[in-house]
Curated annotation (Swiss-Prot):
Gene assigned in the entry: gatA
Role this protein plays: Allows the formation of correctly charged Gln-tRNA(Gln) through the transamidation of misacylated Glu-tRNA(Gln) in organisms which lack glutaminyl-tRNA synthetase. The reaction takes place in the presence of glutamine and ATP through an activated gamma-phospho-Glu-tRNA(Gln).
Protein's UniProt name: Glutamyl-tRNA(Gln) amidotransferase subunit A
Example GO molecular function: ATP binding
Keywords, ordered alphabetically: ATP-binding, Ligase, Nucleotide-binding, Protein biosynthesis
Entry keyword annotation includes Protein biosynthesis: yes
Subunit architecture: Heterotrimer of A, B and C subunits.
Family under the similarity heading: Belongs to the amidase family. GatA subfamily.
Keyword presence, Plastid: no
Pfam families membership: Amidase
Amino acid sequence: MTELNKLTVADSIKGLKNKDFTSTELIGAHIKQIEKHRNLNAYVTDTFDLALKQAEAADQKYAQNNARTLEGIPFAAKDLFCTKGIRTTACSNILKNFIPNYESSVTQNIFDKGGVMLGKTNMDEFAMGSANITSCFGNVISPWKANDDNADLVPGGSSGGSAAAVSGFMASAALGSDTGGSVRQPASFTGLVGFKPTYGRCSRYGMISFASSLDQAGIFTRSVLDSSIMLEAMMGFDEKDSTSIKAEVPELQSAIGSSMKNMKIGVPLSLGEGSIIEPDIMKMWQDTIELLKNAGAEIVDITLPHAKYGVAVYYVIAPAEASSNLSRYDGVRYGLRVERENMTLDEMYEMTRSTGFGEEVKRRIMIGTYVLSSSGMDAYYLKAQKVRRLVANDFNNAFAKVDAILLPAAPTAAFKIGEKQNDPTIMYLNDLFTIPASLAGLPCASVPAGLSARGLPLGIQIIGKQLDEYNVLKVASTIESGVKHIKFEPKGF
């Protein structure tokens, strides 16, 4: 029998219903795995007592044949989802001891379906990073190793703790957030399915904000079916979020295994020209195109002429919104306060923020403050917003001809910790292929599609029309079936 912590969400639900094991046993297996792999630093707060209590309640529900859709299923939450009575820090010193008195809508939705929370996962501070190396709790180490080197690798970011937890069998699924690629890129680096739904599908209420017009909750799982199950639980209109979309939550699980006949897949191969894309990624992209063609899809050449400006646009708009959102951390109402005798209020603000924020967060606040200034507004911010509209228009034009778009999730495989962190521009380019869909608010997923020459997982990205999570899952499922001969599992786990 498969070890309990290695079961997918779907198989765990089946086993619990069949009474092959209890939720308490399932949770116990995951706790044991978490304790065994503390060195990866995936979790920053454990909630084992809560999890065992929730598991006992789940076992009673199964005994009474009254189980909900996620009854007894273990999940983890990125540490920017507020959890009532449980420390929530965004992995920043400025919030290191913050305990919310309310629950985020997304975690509440999962609890309402019977989910069991194992803990809060590590992340880049305030979700600003691509390698999970800016957390106040230290770096996250990927469970994966290259086959020619034993060096520690990054899990991707900013949701690196969630990716490491699911990839290392320390959670069946884990919540992340995706602003410019923070679910899709770590999923690619760790051999997982990472899904970012349409902007507004999941409530942002109770999510600590980075860039409000871009932030969206996402999910890490080890299968496309699991992704569909979790998305059905997470999504839904919420009147507490002004950007929440008033749309019915679709039935998604029937997308799995659906025929690709009459599906048109757009491929903007020109985006791979002259970029930093590695040869292994290019080969994986081409192989996936052939896979979908053989499955019955029609491949259509498309262009996204303004997508190449995505990174530049993103690093104007996102820091501008961050500068505004993070102005609330001033030491007055909550979080860190640095005080000295005879200190003025302005000095307290300055000391609190300079002590509490890390270097990358300070960099982005400074960029954002400048582009919102009188000299930067016309020169950068307003122009970036215009180009953002052009990027969205490119997608609209493409989707008049195709049902989904295929792109790599990242230009490279996972790299060594410390290898690129001294060059912010190189780090920002990790999101080269994920940012355009974020700017347009589109649903998209990364699904494992191959291994590099060094044995590291590579993810392909499927982008869908607004509110069309169904077709994204359909294409992802076809790709998953086509590469089922590849084992996307780190050695030693």
